[in-house]
């Protein structure tokens, strides 16, 4: 048990009485597989059918068998980024745990529902959000609305890892509609409000993109935290390490700070 909303409201009021701000964790790249949206999405005829990234098995393969995944993307947590669902007869994308299916932000109804939820919390009096992996919400699609690797001629996309899967981050991080989605979120949720703060967890974002996204003129996010420095002792994966050099750490942190010095 995590308490009641009455407990939360009492905590929020007490925090504000002591001039403390309450910033909520916000996870909208994905939901739980137990969420009502996802459970409804398992039915192809439900209005929520396109709220997640559902794809059929690769042509010529038996659904649910090894190698039948729509493409060879790997999950951040290991294994395939695709999980077969027997009820729907298709696979859903999960960049993280199979318990965390990715929302389809290309669907305007998804965005509308997310913004509605965010407004509910803001109206309750919270002071902003820490946005989990928010830079992964826009995926790169081809001209036919397909994700990379969905056709046989693209089986070799990306460098293969030890498990036989490719890194999905080049296709899911800082996608082509990220700025559009963040600016829309700003308009729909935060426009006209004062005294709030937003910070985004930003895998795959360069210092230059950090400067753009946090520029007040672009009306996206207030702050980001990056990960360039996390991998300076890694080569390809966190399990493949290289000697740590403090100069590399200084250079990485300096580049991040220099980009937003103004």
Report residues per predicted region.
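Conserved nucleotide-binding/hydrolysis micro-motifs of P-loop NTPases
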Residues: 135-136, 252
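Acidic/aromatic-lined carbohydrate-recognition and catalytic surfaces
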Residues: 1-119, 123, 136-206
């Amino acid at each position: 048990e995590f308490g009641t909303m009455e407990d939360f409201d009492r905590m929020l009021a007490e925090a504000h009485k002591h001039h403390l701000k309450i910033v909520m964790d916000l996870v909208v790249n994905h939901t739980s597989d137990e969420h009502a949206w996802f459970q409804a999405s398992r039915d192809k005829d439900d209005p929520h059918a396109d709220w997640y990234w559902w794809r059929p098995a690769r042509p010529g393969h038996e659904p649910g068998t090894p190698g039948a995944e729509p493409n060879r993307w790997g999950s951040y947590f290991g294994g395939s980024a695709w999980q077969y669902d027997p009820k729907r007869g298709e696979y859903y994308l999960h960049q993280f745990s199979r318990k965390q299916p990715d929302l389809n932000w290309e669907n305007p109804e998804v965005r509308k529902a997310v913004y509605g939820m965010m407004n509910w919390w803001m109206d309750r009096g919270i002071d902003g959000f820490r946005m989990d992996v928010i830079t992964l919400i826009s995926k790169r699609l081809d001209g036919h609305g397909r994700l990379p690797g969905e056709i046989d001629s693209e089986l070799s996309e990306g460098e293969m890892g030890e498990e036989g899967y490719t890194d999905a981050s080049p296709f899911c991080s800082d996608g082509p509609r990220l700025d559009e989605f963040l600016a829309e979120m700003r308009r729909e949720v935060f426009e006209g409000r004062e005294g709030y703060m937003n910070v985004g967890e930003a895998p795959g974002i360069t210092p230059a993109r950090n400067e753009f996204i946090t520029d007040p003129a672009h009306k996206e996010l207030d702050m980001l935290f990056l990960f360039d420095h996390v991998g300076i002792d890694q080569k390809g994966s966190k399990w493949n390490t290289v000697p740590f050099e403090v100069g590399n750490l200084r250079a990485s942190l300096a580049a991040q700070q220099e980009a937003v010095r103004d």
